[in-house]
Amino acid sequence: MEDEGDSPIPRFASRGRAFVYVLPCRDEDLLKVGFSRDPLQRLQTLHARFFRFFDLDRAFLIGTDTVRDARRIERRYIETFADRRSPAPLVVPDAAAGYTEWYRGVHAEAEAIARTLAAEEGFTLHAPLRDWLRALFRERAALLFAWSAKMLEAIEYERFNTPLPRAPSTLERALRDALDCFDELAIDIEPLVPEPVFRWYREN
């Protein structure tokens, strides 16, 4: 159902370019450090509703031209904050959490390191992450109309063929998460989706 070419959720893993990510949790002084060629996919593996779980106004990316540079920067963070490691939040899947890259009470220092690296080595600092994500989602906004229509059609088929009561299905959660993400990024979804999809979103 969610063909990558049709989905409004961007995928863009590049061969050489990589990103170091620093992701503070919204509700506690805890953050995740790592690197990825596809930061959005990484966000989604950490939490399906990453846009509410992480603080997008304090999160940031460091863009590098090579994976080697990304690994080096990640290693610097790991070594600098070694004495401030913290367990991953329970809501983060074990397979996605990592074992040594969650830290408590280090956001200001992590941001200072990033700004120094950008100034001294020319890396691109994407801060806040919200702006980077908004630009990325706007690039794919034109795909949202057809994708959301397909999703709602499948949801309605499920609804009429599944006994009630029932919990929200995987398809319902996927559609709501996608629309909530656009909304969180201050992208007006009403003109981007069919009227029945917008009505479903507001009523469910």
Region spans (language model):
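Non-catalytic accessory segments flanking enzymatic or RNA/DNA-binding domains
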Residues: 1-204
